Curated annotation (Swiss-Prot):
<dbReference type="GO" id="GO:0005654">
    <property type="term" value="C:nucleoplasm"/>
</dbReference>
<dbReference type="GO" id="GO:0021571">
    <property type="term" value="P:rhombomere 5 development"/>
</dbReference>
<dbReference type="GO" id="GO:0008045">
    <property type="term" value="P:motor neuron axon guidance"/>
</dbReference>
<feature type="glycosylation site" description="O-linked (GlcNAc) threonine">
    <location>
        <position position="149"/>
    </location>
</feature>
<keyword id="KW-0371">Homeobox</keyword>
<keyword id="KW-0325">Glycoprotein</keyword>
<dbReference type="GO" id="GO:0045944">
    <property type="term" value="P:positive regulation of transcription by RNA polymerase II"/>
</dbReference>
<keyword id="KW-0238">DNA-binding</keyword>
<dbReference type="GO" id="GO:0021569">
    <property type="term" value="P:rhombomere 3 development"/>
</dbReference>
<feature type="compositionally biased region" description="Low complexity">
    <location>
        <begin position="309"/>
        <end position="331"/>
    </location>
</feature>
<dbReference type="GO" id="GO:0071361">
    <property type="term" value="P:cellular response to ethanol"/>
</dbReference>
<feature type="region of interest" description="Interaction with OGT">
    <location>
        <begin position="71"/>
        <end position="199"/>
    </location>
</feature>
<feature type="compositionally biased region" description="Basic residues">
    <location>
        <begin position="59"/>
        <end position="71"/>
    </location>
</feature>
<dbReference type="GO" id="GO:0000981">
    <property type="term" value="F:DNA-binding transcription factor activity, RNA polymerase II-specific"/>
</dbReference>
<dbReference type="InterPro" id="IPR020479">
    <property type="entry name" value="HD_metazoa"/>
</dbReference>
<feature type="short sequence motif" description="Antp-type hexapeptide">
    <location>
        <begin position="200"/>
        <end position="205"/>
    </location>
</feature>
<feature type="region of interest" description="Disordered">
    <location>
        <begin position="279"/>
        <end position="331"/>
    </location>
</feature>
Amino acid sequence: MNSFLEYPILGSGDSGTCSARAYPSDHGITTFQSCAVSANSCGGDDRFLVGRGVQISSPHHHHHHHHHHHPQTATYQTSGNLGISYSHSSCGPSYGAQNFSAPYGPYGLNQEADVSGGYPPCAPAVYSGNLSTPMVQHHHHHQGYAGGTVGSPQYIHHSYGQEQQTLALATYNNSLSPLHASHQEACRSPASETSSPAQTFDWMKVKRNPPKTGKVGEYGYVGQPNAVRTNFTTKQLTELEKEFHFNKYLTRARRVEIAASLQLNETQVKIWFQNRRMKQKKREKEGLLPISPATPPGSDEKTEESSEKSSPSPSAPSPASSTSDTLTTSH
């Protein structure tokens, strides 16, 4: 990050000229070079002050009428009120310290700044620019002295790093301003919707009787715990009651046969017989019906199965004949 400080002084006539000089700045502490400002020549103990008693001196001076580059080192610090004084033994008119207050704003380290300006010889300098309050480090300065008539020149120092940063932030904010506006509108819209009474949709309502999802079989809904209740017709109920009167328990073959004859499925017939048996027991407990002889469950089924599988058995003696036989033997 080597930078050079250029001080070209262009003079005319009898007035001495100072060759254009470029000095590299020290990277540890930013350097500021000085050039003898006089009406006749550049030489001797040349110095000028920047800030509160901070002296910037140039120990070596070289008089050349051609452009040369000589490295020199000088340090400077800045303060709120910048005072600049020029002193030279051979300077014709006596120039006192030009004290003034220049507003400046600090900018961060490692920022580059371009410096350009014009200085005629032995003239009061006007300083305006931005310098950091502590020591400014690692800056590229390109400074020049341009000769002309003795007047009020200006030494301009611009902090391009800070300006670019502020410009970038400004453009960034400007570019994002419509986005922020749209985002704020989007944020406000849900609030306005929530403030209004909420709309109730059909899917939000609680269904007390949800629709049946069971597959419709040949005889209605099958295989679901919440199956639709079967509405039996009068003919179906009559046939089921007749069968229940003779057989409280059905075999699977008989159940299939009844289901086919009544256009019902096997499950419906089975459930109807289960419910009918529970109803029968309930009535017997209440005393509405006489208690039927207790038959173990499945006895009728076993008898039916045995009757279906076995061949017809020989006729058994009737109870009347058996009693008559016993009476005759007793006599």
